[in-house]
From Swiss-Prot:
Part of the 50S ribosomal subunit. Contacts protein L32. InterPro entries: Ribosomal_bL17, Ribosomal_bL17_CS, Ribosomal_bL17_sf. It comes from Xylella fastidiosa (strain 9a5c). GO terms for cellular component: cytosolic large ribosomal subunit. This is Large ribosomal subunit protein bL17.
Length: 126
């Protein structure tokens, strides 16, 4: 029986699921905004938000814990240099999910995953 087993499986092995979310979190930290399916976006919050909470206190031990989960030096650097200091005063809820319709091929519900308080780059209008 699978009583009290939280989390979705996404028809993937444990290692594949872990690698997928590690890559998605690294992309989220790098680009501040990614587009994915709604169920993956909801599970992504469960992986990304504890890492941001960890990054609020910059220590060697916390950096090693973050690297063990992400396996990406660039993402760990961004996490501790930009995101940790940005959210020091916020007690949680660092990520916003915005539903954005359905995918063409299989009609899967899609969503944008966005970091709150991200810097908006203004594009020049000609």
């Amino acid at each position: 029986m699978r009583h009290q087993k939280s989390g979705r499986k996404f028809n993937r092995t444990d290692a594949h699921r872990g690698a997928m979310f590690s890559n998605m979190v690294a992309s989220l930290f790098k680009y501040q905004l990614i587009k994915t399916t709604l169920p993956k976006a909801k599970e992504l919050r469960r992986v990304a938000e504890p890492l941001i909470t960890l990054a609020k206190v910059d220590s060697v031990a916390n950096r090693r814990l973050a690297f063990a989960r992400l396996r990406n030096k660039e993402a760990v650097g961004i996490l501790f240099s930009n995101l940790g200091p940005r959210y020091v005063t916020r007690p949680g809820g660092y990520i916003r999910l915005l539903k954005c319709g359905f995918r063409h091929g299989d009609n899967a519900p899609m969503a944008y995953v966005e970091m709150l308080e991200r810097p908006i780059i203004a594009e020049e209008v000609t």
